[in-house]
Each structure stands twice: as C-alpha cells, then as structure tokens.
Amino acid sequence: MKNLLIPLLFICVLGSAQTRPIAIIGYHIGTVALGAIADAQFDEGNKNLAHMLHATEVVTLISGPFIFDVKRNEALAYILSYGFLRFSFFDSAYNLTRDLPILFNGSTSTYDRVMNTVPEHGRAFMKSWSLVVGVSIPIKYF
C-alpha cells in the first residue's frame, strides 16, 4: 500500500498546479488508485480502513465535476475519460497493493473470467489503448 500512497499524494499536489486537462487526468487516476487501494484493503481484512477509503473515493467522484466546473456538454467526455482510465489502472493498482503480479486476474467475478480468456499480451494491449483514449479525451475536450 505504501507503494501507491506516495504517487497518489504526488499526483494530488502536482495536479493543483496543472492545466485543466492534466488536472482532470491526475484526479481520475488518483480516484481510481484510491478505490483500488480500498478494495485491496477490504480483501486483506482491514475493513475500517477500507470503508474510510471507499467513502473518500465516493466524495472525490461526486465532487470532481464541481471542482473542475464540468459543463453539461462536457459530462459525457468526463465520464468516459474516467471509465477508460479506471479500466487501465484499477487492476494494476489493486495488484500492487496486494503484492500480486501486475497483470494478475482472479477467478471469481465475471470480469475476471472474461479477462482470463484473453492472453496477457492482449490484456496489456487493451489496457494500453484504454490509457491512450482516457488521456486523450480530456486533452481534446477540456
């Protein structure tokens, strides 16, 4: 968990001094990391810490559009950017927190079973393109 908290704090501090698109990208990545850390802590048995981190994640998700003054016509781009960045980073952040291999997928959820049918290089390819799209959307539309 320590491996992820330092970059998360770094993103928060640097994000406040950036242009709007870069700040939105950093905010989304930080929120995704927060959720992944919370899920990993919950699965490790640290329920109180996990609940606190999940509550913080919900607050950041709800407050994001107000912080960045997202207009109605920008809302879809904002949501899509978050979705693509979440697909790119969530599993990796979760796995780093739990000390698992970075491209590891479990076997319990439907998502895990579907992703396990894709070879590792295919998963890396999908997550890489998702990262490119997730970063490109705020740069183009904000």
What would you call each of these model-derived segments?
Residues Q18-F142:
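Hydrophobic alpha-helical membrane segments
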Residues M1-L4, G26:
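Intrinsically disordered, low-complexity peptide-like regions
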Residues N3-L14:
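Sec-dependent N-terminal signal peptides
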